[in-house]
């Protein structure tokens, strides 16, 4: 998705193109086969879900053909993780590749150790305590998490930025998108992001299974794979999207 002369333009392909992704199941298959994929177009041509779908079907509110709705379905199924993983923008990581990303992005640190070593700010700690120890399997609405973590008018600032940073470090993901529920148990409003730890999706042992490797070796594995799959991509472009 690009802004051209003040107008947002979607980039994609025709329905009858043999490379076109037509359904959420096809999207899941493609992501699992490739391993990871940004949601929207970026500096590497072809490396996004957007560019492999029909532009006119985005935000059509038809789950059969709307890629914007697919992202919520994929997040909800807990087979592939979804979040802001690519240059602080949204995308998907398969179960196969998640440990490699986690080892590199976390530099081999669990969050509590990262914080204890002075490498994470207190505002991140206030968010993460809601997903650690007895809260390890929590799934929390964005608006509720903001309150629980002490963000708001008279509290911490920069909630959205903190969430994005924790996703980039692969500590959190979007595990669902749901409508809020009022006191009478009735859903209302727009769908709201629901967050969880990535360990909640895949389990601690699996997520940390590459901790035994040097984080720079995991980085090299990611870069070498991208060079193989997108040989035309420049190193600068690869670093930008994967750092």
Describe the residue ranges of each PLM region.
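Long, low-complexity intrinsically disordered regions
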Residues: 1-243
